[in-house]
């Protein structure tokens, strides 16, 4: 799932990672999804539709339907998290191919968001004010834009709704294995977002790994270099365990 701050979802992003996964034997798909002004859960409904599509067409694409993983960065990382933590939550299954499951067997999140109410945590009061604005993208995602008599609302206006739209609001111990990566110098999404997710998953005895990448920011060069890409590919190989070439391969979305 490509990042884009909930305002874009260009499926052509992160081609280096996708090629590396394909070279490792995975079937790789890149999915676009609805962005603001569409409100949550549209974004998650689209992600789950993409998973169901791949599972429904597994034979056609040579996919093992029992071994599907998700990967995303930034807003796409949030979406990868949400897809993983909502395994079995049927209320988010809308659209086609409803006869197949949208559950995934592995999830990787790269500088993703786990708590929409604390994206700028630790960055100081000026950044806090930005995220408290009704015009922040997370507020638009959860509450929608101002329109006619509706003035819009801060992400803090309805904490219950914000939590329902946040991965941390769904962790219950039934999650698949997670690989969580974040840049130590990220100036946009606080690394505490990933640390919180890791702690929540481990508290429920979920198989989770957390990697804080030194000298990495948000979407800068370290994320497109060999060490990070190999870490992700090797983790998927370990968790999804690709089989012989003549058999069905796992898939990464």
Name the predicted role of every residue range:
Residues 121-170, 176, 203:
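Mobile cap/lid helix-loop segments that gate and shape the active-site cleft of serine hydrolases
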Residues 174, 179-182, 186:
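Short beta-strand/loop motif that positions the catalytic acidic residue
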Residues 9-12, 17, 29-65, 222-228:
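Catalytic nucleophile-loop/oxyanion-hole region of alpha/beta-hydrolase
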Residues 202-219:
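Catalytic histidine neighborhood in serine/cysteine hydrolases
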Residues 225-253:
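Catalytic active-site module of serine/aspartate enzymes centered on a nucleophile-bearing elbow/loop
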């Amino acid at each position: 799932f490509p990042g884009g701050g909930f305002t874009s979802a260009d499926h052509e992003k992160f081609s280096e990672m996708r090629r590396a996964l394909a070279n490792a034997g995975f079937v790789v798909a890149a999915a676009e999804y609805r962005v603001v002004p569409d409100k949550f859960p549209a974004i998650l409904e689209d992600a789950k539709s993409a998973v169901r599509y791949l599972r429904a067409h597994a034979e056609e694409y040579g996919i093992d339907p029992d071994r599907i993983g998700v990967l995303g960065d930034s807003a796409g990382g949030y979406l990868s998290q949400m897809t993983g933590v909502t395994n079995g939550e049927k209320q988010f299954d809308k659209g086609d191919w409803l006869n197949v499951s949208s559950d995934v067997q592995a999830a990787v999140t790269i500088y993703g968001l786990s708590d929409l109410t604390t994206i700028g945590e630790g960055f100081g009061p000026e950044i806090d004010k930005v995220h408290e604005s009704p015009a922040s993208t997370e507020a638009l995602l959860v509450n929608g834009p101002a329109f006619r008599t509706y003035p819009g609302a801060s992400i803090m206006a309805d904490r219950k709704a914000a939590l329902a739209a946040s991965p941390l609001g769904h962790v219950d111990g039934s999650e698949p294995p997670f690989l969580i990566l974040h840049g130590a110098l990220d100036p946009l999404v606080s690394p505490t977002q990933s640390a919180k997710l890791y702690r929540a998953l481990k508290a429920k005895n979920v198989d989770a790994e957390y990697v804080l990448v030194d000298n990495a920011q948000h979407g800068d060069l370290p994320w497109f270099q060999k060490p990070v890409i190999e870490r992700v590919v090797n983790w998927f190989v370990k968790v999804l365990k690709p089989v012989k070439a003549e058999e069905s391969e796992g898939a990464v979305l």
